[in-house]
Design a protein with these regions (language model features):
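Beta-rich carbohydrate-recognition and catalytic domains
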Residues: 1-21, 30-145, 155-216
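Beta-propeller and closely related beta-sheet repeat lectin domains
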Residues: 22-27, 94-97, 149-152, 222-226
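Short basic/hydrophobic patches in alpha-helices and adjacent helix-turn junctions
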Residues: 183-186, 224-228
């Protein structure tokens, strides 16, 4: 995972630097004077076969805008002890979406359908990180696919947060991805309140990715982030 300085128009403004040597699907959150990066790593068994994925948290100190690694560790799999369903089994964890609850606590959208938010204690005065709350709510089902992940939420009005998610549905011979948005209460229990009925973005069916040697025959679009 790399970091790249950008200007006000989000254009590259300097060289890229390696931040984390192994990982994918990062979501970053500034919490006080720290940068928290939630990401996943692919697990492999003794035969080097894919055996799921693990969510990771890397904490960085921010000094003069430059991150210095403090610690990085794996987060528990299936923290809510949910029954395995689809790719949300006990061995697969990814796409947790972080947002600030307080200077020492982070909320994590664990899933949209069913809706689950987990509170994580990130007090810098304590070395250990632990889950300190669980807030289920009404499921957000979407006819354009099963919702996964999303951008770290931003304020929407006085009392809500908004996040832009991605979803996928099988169309013909491939998965087609779409982007939507949902709003939920800023305060506990973080109840979801609204969702876009139609996609804000829809990936083209013929993406042309095969031209670049990418074997995945999917039509993919992901929201990377949102600027307030």
């Amino acid at each position: 995972l790399w970091v790249l300085p950008v200007d006000e128009q989000l254009r590259p403004a300097g060289p890229a630097e390696l931040l984390i040597g192994r990982g994918e699907d990062p979501r970053a959150l500034v919490l006080g004077d720290r940068l928290l990066v939630f990401y996943c790593v692919i697990d492999r068994d003794e035969a080097d076969a894919v055996a799921g994925s693990t969510m990771m948290l890397a904490e960085f100190a921010l000094a003069d805008g430059r991150p210095t690694l403090l610690q990085a560790f794996g987060l528990p799999k299936n923290p809510l002890q949910l029954a395995a369903a689809g790719d949300r089994g006990a061995v697969w964890e990814k796409n947790w979406v972080p947002f600030e609850i307080s200077p020492t606590q982070v909320g994590l959208i664990y899933s949209h359908d069913p809706w689950h938010v987990i509170a994580l204690d990130c007090d810098p005065a304590r070395d250990a990180r632990r889950f300190v709350g669980h807030f289920p709510g009404p499921s957000l089902s979407w006819r354009h696919g099963h919702i996964r992940g999303g951008t770290p939420p931003l304020p929407y009005g006085d009392d809500q947060l908004i996040t832009f998610f991605h979803a996928s549905a099988v169309v013909g011979s491939r998965k087609v991805y779409a982007v939507g948005a949902c709003c939920f209460d800023r305060a506990a229990p973080y109840t979801p309140r609204a969702i876009t009925r139609e996609p804000l973005l829809l990936a083209p069916y013929n993406s042309g990715a095969h031209r670049f040697g990418w074997p995945f025959a999917g039509s993919v679009v992901f929201p990377l982030g949102a600027q307030h």
